[in-house]
Amino acid sequence: MNTRIELITPIITEGVRSLAEVQPFERADLTVTHSLIVQGPASIESEFDEALSVPDTVRKAIDAERRGANAIIIDCMGDPGLHACREVVTIPVLGPCQTALHTAGTLGHAFAFVTVLDRLRSMLAKLVASYGLSDNYACFRAVDIPVLDISHNLTSLNAALAREAIAAVKQDHADVIVLGCTGFLGCAGAIRQGLLAQGLDVPVIDPIPLAIHVADALVKTGLSHSKLTYPPPRRKAVAGYRFPEFADGGKA
């Protein structure tokens, strides 16, 4: 069975995500396509940014299923609009954060987030709690690099990420590292080498590749989200949004 996964980047900034970055994970039976929202924030670094990103992310999810996607991944560690998207489509929708955190629980007892900015600390702690994993949360560490600056100096970025990962293991007793921004795609190898150089054999989870393979597994095993948990929205009056499918009488 061929799987087509739609990667939805929930920001409006072009060039942040390239299909070339995910092509190494494609196979003859697995294709990844990509879309960017057109209404929302330039980046997601706060609850406010996340709220702005959700409506068009949901719209893109509906459109992706109509175009034949078999699964959807929301390309942000805040998992914006995850539950709403699951309500409006029938195919699997994965949040890279939820996927990474539950996988971390199978690889160790205490995970650490290594992410972009310290201001995300409470936002990610709330997300961890919502996924029922607070007892497994070792620590939060940030490299103080805004999302849109990630690609400016990858050598410096990798060094900073490795430094924080080592500190998370040595000082906070983390035994799994979770990259806390999907913009860090491709950095896991360098961080792992930095850990090994310190004698620390600790797994480093790169959320997007993991989500791609989990989504593919769900599709190939015929699994998707329970509609008892994620029932379709009831039709009602809707103003200011492009959701005729769920507006009263089918009209926005």
Sequence positions of predicted segments:
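Periplasmic-binding protein-like
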Residues: 66-76, 173-182
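Extended, histidine- and acidic-residue-enriched regions that form the cofactor-binding/catalytic faces
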Residues: 9-10, 166-199, 214-218, 229, ...
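N-terminal glycine-rich anion-binding loop in soluble enzyme alpha/beta folds
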Residues: 1-55, 116-154, 247-248
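Active-site rim beta-loop-alpha module in soluble metabolic enzymes
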Residues: 128-182, 187-192
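Glycine-rich, highly charged phosphate/nucleotide-binding loops
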Residues: 46-63, 156-164
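Short, glycine-/small-residue-rich phosphate/pyrophosphate-handling segment
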Residues: 105-143, 152-156, 216-252
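Conserved beta-strand elements of the Class I
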Residues: 6, 111-114, 175
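Short, acidic/small-residue loops that bind anionic groups at enzyme active sites
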Residues: 86-107, 191-212
